[in-house]
């Protein structure tokens, strides 16, 4: 907006300096301003809110992944057409890949709705109770479950002699993509996290863990990481759908103006919440069965094809 206003002022200044006929100059200035008002009104009336998952939706190639050129071009065109584009991810902001942070998204719904950011300003953040955060480690140990705490600035890992293979992969990925933030551990005196993921094996007591923590958390069963079970643990009341609602209310929009894009089971809350729901061609079967449109896989220009299908670019 600041750039647009500066551009208008520059055009007006140029017009005044070049045109000696003051009446003609004023008429030209009014035309410039009217064109601007019409353009912004058109964009505002036709603006849509686009929400994208990250892994498997915007990022291809596994971990750490990359954003295909066709996707970058499509996102830029969507913004140029006046649409707002948002990340809506299970990842907290501290675990966002650099490829995502480098792109000028208009906002973020992070950590399954635990934080909502718009134009660089945090609109909402769920603060976990301090005593609850520090009580979790003993419950996890009792239930023989391994976990990663995910925060806005850092992720926290257990100190264990035999970490599950996916935990090691997550730790290595975090180390590669978050060079400015050191790896932290559960015994850190300050635990600043919003949600966490858990992994289980045949020795884990998942039912007991659910029973001990269900008062405070919801559980999202994710795809199996054979031979491990994998769940996201999110504060009650937080979800990707709830993050969308917060943005919609803040902007005075409606769910009818929203389009959501995902591929995984943790996207189901938003995919079933919004009419215009798009599954990537590489999505899991449960996701494919719960969306209004299926596009091609991310590596085959899935985002660009979907945006074209809906007339967004």
Question: Locations of the language-model features?
Answer:
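Conserved acidic, metal-coordinating active-site core of Asp-based
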Residues: 145, 150-261, 265, 270-273, ...
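Short, Lys/Arg-enriched N-terminal segments with co-localized hydrophobic residues
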Residues: 33-44
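Asp-based, Mg2+/Mn2+-dependent phosphohydrolase catalytic module
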Residues: 273, 281-313
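Active-site phosphate-binding/coordination module
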Residues: 67-165
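Asp-based phosphoryl-transfer active-site loop
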Residues: 48-61
